[in-house]
Amino acid sequence: MHRRIEARIVDARLGSEIPLPDYATDGSAAIDLRACLDEPLALEPGQRRLIGTGLAVNIHDPGLVGVVASRSGLSLKHGLRVAQGIGVIDSDYHGEIGVILAHDGTEPYTITPGERIAQLLFQPVVQVTLDYVSAFSATTERGEGGFGHSGTL
């Protein structure tokens, strides 16, 4: 499936000094987001920083959401991840996409201007209306069993 979404450059370095966000390969599910920085930024272990990407999008369709996710290589090799697990870009948000990076590694890491820091993918959304009830209309075998209640193997 392919859709067109309007994108706006909000940092003049994007597209000149810093490559435009794009899919790395034909089979990539997500667009790489790059750090729009004036200079290298050192992250110490345990530190979090909000990093601008220079990009804004107009998803427009409430049936789509932008999802900002960690890059596996940065997480595995350096302990850098999107701080809140994922970032959600709502269809009506038009501001610059920022990435909150958390550093879980043991050594300082320096982010360079233009470095790929996260990935942006687009997913369908189903909005629901919650019907508040005192008891559910159906029961399940699991019931209210929480973590670990579905088995170990």
Curated annotation (Swiss-Prot):
EC number: 3.6.1.23
Enzyme class: hydrolase
Domain of life: Bacteria
Catalytic activity: dUTP + H2O = dUMP + diphosphate + H(+)
UniProt-listed PANTHER family: DEOXYURIDINE 5'-TRIPHOSPHATE NUCLEOTIDOHYDROLASE (PTHR11241:SF0)
MF (Gene Ontology): dUTP diphosphatase activity; magnesium ion binding
Pathway membership, UniProt: Pyrimidine metabolism; dUMP biosynthesis; dUMP from dCTP (dUTP route): step 2/2
Cofactor(s) it depends on: Mg(2+)
Presence of the UniProt keyword GTP-binding in the record: no
Alphabetical list of CDD domains matching this protein: trimeric_dUTPase
Residues given in the record as substrate binding sites: 71-73, 84, 88-90
Any Pfam family the entry gives: dUTPase
Species classification: Bacteria, Pseudomonadati, Pseudomonadota, Gammaproteobacteria, Chromatiales
Species in which this protein is naturally found: Halorhodospira halophila (strain DSM 244 / SL1) (Ectothiorhodospira halophila (strain DSM 244 / SL1))
Alphabetical UniProt keywords: Hydrolase, Magnesium, Metal-binding, Nucleotide metabolism
Role description: This enzyme is involved in nucleotide metabolism: it produces dUMP, the immediate precursor of thymidine nucleotides and it decreases the intracellular concentration of dUTP so that uracil cannot be incorporated into DNA.
A GO BP annotation: dUTP catabolic process
InterPro entries given in the database record: dUTPase, dUTPase-like, dUTPase-like_sf, dUTPase_trimeric
Membership in a protein family: Belongs to the dUTPase family.
Designated name of the protein: Deoxyuridine 5'-triphosphate nucleotidohydrolase
